Amino acid sequence: MSDKLLYTLARPFLFAIDPEAAHNLTLPALRRAAAMGLTSSIVKPAHDPRTVMGITFPNPVGLAAGLDKDGAYIDGLATLGFGSIEVGTVTPRAQPGNPMPRMFRLPKANAIINRMGFNNGGADAFVANVRSSKFYQNKEGVLGLNIGKNADTPIERAVDDYLICLEKVYPYASYVTVNISSPNTKNLRQLQGASELDALLSQLKEAQQRLSDQHKRYVPIALKIAPDMELEQIQTIAQALLRHKMDGVIATNTTVSREAVKGLKYAEETGGLSGAPVFEASNTVIRALKSELGDALPIIGVGGILSGNDAQAKIAAGASLVQLYTGLIYRGPALVKECAAALHA
């Protein structure tokens, strides 16, 4: 049975239950299926290597952070054909996130609203999960580790949390993503301001250089940014990335705008909106970044990819790689192969 047919059969059941409950059923089931060899029939994308941030990605279609916050399902996700897997966001200490319900489907818009709030088991448990994965142990592919700050850490001390996480995850990452753009942690997006960003990037770069010397291995750092910005702020961020010699930028996170989903059930729920409604906003940010960065810094495009054509549009806007999340929920794992085929050089 093809992965497309299997997901077509499973989706009505998954969509009949709470989104977070469906998530909590699907990932353990995938892990068990992978352990039993049941995912071996999934046809993987053609080898289509891209070198980005000094890393060779086997194909340009990655998994975005957020699906596997604790790095507990890496081996199962690795069977779906991604060119990279990004897990997290992880914070220094475990935290429960926001109260439930905190995830809502908007199927008429191919969208999701979430206000999860960086729920995770903390950096030590995260690292233990990563280290125990066969994907990491056997160096099977590209693994991105996404870091954030605890909800109860004052925004003035946010840098401390990022430095703690960077120190812990650095030895195990192919690259590290610094998430300063979730709308679900109070004041987090303030870190995208000019002075706050300068202070953060300066200390991250200093720590990266020290850790590179310590571990005899350079691990690139990418910054994940929001779609809800004016051109001037995007330009300011791009200039800061160049000034501090960062390695990449991921555009974009979820949006707080509700323009595209007005009138739909759950549209007024607080949180970040992902899926089709963020597609154009993300592309606008990517184009603005590309205009500022040129070829000096690579862009990873994420936001609203639900087809191979969508993936092509991200690359046309200026991205070097793409990532999926919400599209997987609506289209299933067949989307990975479809996007990879559309981007095959």
From Swiss-Prot:
GO terms for molecular function: dihydroorotate dehydrogenase (quinone) activity. Pathway: Pyrimidine metabolism; UMP biosynthesis via de novo pathway; orotate from (S)-dihydroorotate (quinone route): step 1/1. FMN binds at residues 65-69, 89, 146, 179, 224, 252, 275, 304, 325-326. It is found in: Cell membrane. Catalyzes the conversion of dihydroorotate to orotate with quinone as electron acceptor. It is a peripheral membrane protein. GO terms for biological process: 'de novo' pyrimidine nucleobase biosynthetic process; 'de novo' UMP biosynthetic process. Its EC number is 1.3.5.2. This is Dihydroorotate dehydrogenase (quinone). Belongs to the dihydroorotate dehydrogenase family. Type 2 subfamily. Binds 1 FMN per subunit. The lineage of its organism: Bacteria, Pseudomonadati, Pseudomonadota, Betaproteobacteria, Burkholderiales. The keyword Flavoprotein applies. The keyword Acyltransferase does not apply. One of its GO terms (cellular component) is cytoplasm. It comes from the Bacteria. It catalyses: (S)-dihydroorotate + a quinone = orotate + a quinol. Monomer. InterPro entries: Aldolase_TIM, DHO_dehydrogenase, Dihydroorotate_DH_1_2, Dihydroorotate_DH_2, Dihydroorotate_DH_cat, Dihydroorotate_DH_CS. Substrate binds at residues 69, 114-118, 179, 184, 253-254. Keywords: Cell membrane, Flavoprotein, FMN, Membrane, Oxidoreductase, Pyrimidine biosynthesis. Its cofactor is FMN. It comes from Janthinobacterium sp. (strain Marseille).
